[in-house]
Amino acid sequence: MNKFLIIDGLNLVRRIYAAIPDENDMESLTERVSVACTKLLRIHHPTHVAVVWDGDEISWRKQLYPDYKKGRKPMPEPLAAGLIALQEHLQNLQIQSIYAAAEADDVIATLATKTAKAQGEALIVSTDKGFSQLNHPRISQWDHFNQQYLNIAELEQKLGVDRSQFLDLMALAGDSGNKIPGIPGIGPKSAAELLRTFRTLATLFSSLPNLGAKQAKKLAEGRDMARLSYKLVQLQTDLPLNINLRDFRVNSPTKASSNNL
């Protein structure tokens, strides 16, 4: 069975970079990233590996909602300047890259989903909780920095809702880190309480007459913003990838399947 290790490139690299005392020391960054990737291969024994990188195009999310991720600090100049050399170094280690047009998240989600549907196993290396919406028994997530799999029970306890309600929760409460608006006046706690009672957005919005007047008014006025927020948070899982598994085989290119994804 194929096991695809899918590394969220900037999620890994930027956190390693932040721990380096000298921001211009790209040699140390390259060494630490190489060690991290080698460790990932040693621990998880994948048949295939790829690092997925964000692209420079304006994402469809930004076009849909211009405030999306507004205010985020730009990539530090030394890192931006040294990124190509780092990617080339990984290629020399037989760790190939996939370059998204805009955001890597949708490419990662698509690659993981297609791998799972092809009866393979996908392991996403990222600290991004947004990947928890990929609820499939053959898709898992690994936090390299804490050296552990995403604990769904802990995540559900923290969010206050089931994993299957993640998108609905974000639609109501938003996500301040990504500037996802949610519904004004509905915070994470009240959103979780509503979803524990009504289970889904559809049921919630059809039950507004059963709520208090003030809360019902907030929800009614924020319905369109909830729909927008849901769309912004939802990962695309059906992008055309146009890649060949052979190119991402770990250490055994001559034995690779010629399957396309």
From Swiss-Prot:
Start and end residues of each stretch annotated as Interaction with DNA: 185-190
KW Nucleotide-binding (keyword) present: no
GO molecular function: 5'-3' exonuclease activity; 5'-flap endonuclease activity; DNA binding; magnesium ion binding; potassium ion binding
EC number(s) stated in the UniProt entry for this protein: 3.1.-.-
Stated name of the protein: Flap endonuclease Xni
Residues that hold K(+) according to the record: 172-173, 181, 183, 186
Function as written in the Swiss-Prot or TrEMBL entry: Has flap endonuclease activity. During DNA replication, flap endonucleases cleave the 5'-overhanging flap structure that is generated by displacement synthesis when DNA polymerase encounters the 5'-end of a downstream Okazaki fragment.
Coiled-coil ranges per UniProt: none
Domain 5'-3' exonuclease: 164-256
InterPro entries for this protein: 5-3_exonucl_a-hlix_arch_N (IPR020046), 5-3_exonuclease (IPR002421), 5-3_exonuclease_C_sf (IPR036279), DNA_polI_H3TH (IPR020045), FEN (IPR038969), HhH2 (IPR008918), PIN-like_dom_sf (IPR029060), Xni (IPR022895)
Co-factor binding comment: Binds 2 Mg(2+) per subunit. Only one magnesium ion has a direct interaction with the protein, the other interactions are indirect.
Entry's family note: Belongs to the Xni family.
Class of the enzyme per the UniProt entry, highest EC level: hydrolase
UniProtKB keywords: DNA-binding, Endonuclease, Hydrolase, Magnesium, Metal-binding, Nuclease, Potassium
GO biological process, one term: DNA replication, Okazaki fragment processing
Necessary cofactors: Mg(2+); K(+)
Binding site for Mg(2+): 105
Database matches in Pfam families: 5_3_exonuc, 5_3_exonuc_N
CDD domains tied to this protein: H3TH_53EXO, PIN_53EXO
